């Protein structure tokens, strides 16, 4: 049951996680995946089949823009960065997610309100 809860939480917070990372700096897809894996281990890792569609949805929504850059001979990388709208959305989403996480910890730890 815990695995399904983690999966649901990850699915529901993927956009906020990506926006939060891109708020720090521009990154390419593999770099984003590696950063998620480094910070969250297997619990936050995203497959290419989940990562790139999520990035494309953010791009279609005007929150992220992408550009191609040479990364060596005959090789390019697609870098993602936040638009102004994306930065505002990231700030709001990350703050809401952090507030919700604190609330969940407080409620589930049995600490008085």
Q: Predicted segment positions?
A:
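Long, low-complexity, charged/polar intrinsically disordered regions in eukaryotic proteins
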Residues: 1-2
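N-terminal helix-turn-helix DNA-binding core of bacterial DNA-binding proteins
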Residues: 6-50
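Basic amphipathic alpha-helical segments that dock to polyanions
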Residues: 51-58
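Beta-hairpin "wing" of winged helix-turn-helix
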Residues: 59-76, 81
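Accessory beta->alpha helical hairpin/"wing" motif in late/C-terminal subdomains of nucleic-acid enzymes
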Residues: 82-87
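Amphipathic alpha-helical dimerization/coiled-coil segments
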Residues: 88-113
